Amino acid sequence: MSNPQVAKVFLGVDYGERRIGLAYAAYPLGISLPIGFIATGKTLEATAKLLVGIIQERRVSTVVLGNPLPMQKGQKSALQEDILKLSSLLQESCPVEVILWDERLSSAQAERMLKGDCGLSRKKRKGKTDSIAATLILTSFLEHSPRLPS
C-alpha cells in the first residue's frame, strides 16, 4: 500500500507599511507563485483579519512571514515589532503554523529583478515588487527549511 504525502499549503507574506505581498505554494510540488498584494490594514488587527480570510480561502496550513532581521545585531526595527505582533495575531485567529523567515534584502532583490530583467517602469513595478518579494521569501524557505523532507 502506498503512503501518499499529505500536501501542505504555504502562504508567503512580505509585510510592508502600505502593501503586503503574497505568494502561494503547495508541497511537495514546491513551486512558489506570486498571487498579488493587499493593502495593509489601518491596524495590525485589521491586517490579521484580511490575512485570515486569505488563509481560510486557500486552505493554508503554514504561513511563511518575512522577518526583516537587522544587518547589525541587537537592533530591532518598528517593522520587525509589527511583524512579531502580526505573527501572534495570526496564530490566535486561526489554526495555522506561522514561521518567521529571514527576508533581508528580498524587496531590493525583487526590485532589481523587475527593473533590470523585466525592464518595468517604476509605476508598473508598484505592487509587483511586494508579491515577487513574497515569492522569494517562500522559495528560500522551501529550499532551505530543515522541516521539509528532501
From Swiss-Prot:
Offer one example of a GO biological process linked to this entry: rRNA 5'-end processing
Coiled coil ranges: none
Spell out the SUPFAM superfamilies in the cross-references: Ribonuclease H-like
Q: Which Pfam families does the UniProt record give?
A: RuvX
- What Gene Ontology terms describe what this protein does at the molecular function level? nuclease activity
**Keyword set, alphabetical order:** Cytoplasm, Hydrolase, Nuclease, Ribosome biogenesis
Protein localization:
Cytoplasm
Q: What is its EC number?
A: 3.1.-.-
Please indicate if the UniProt record lists Nuclease as a keyword: yes
What SMART domains does the entry give?
A: YqgFc
Per the record, GO CC terms?
cytosol
Q: Which family does it belong to?
A: Belongs to the YqgF nuclease family.
Q: What does this protein do?
A: Could be a nuclease involved in processing of the 5'-end of pre-16S rRNA.
Q: What is this protein called?
A: Putative pre-16S rRNA nuclease
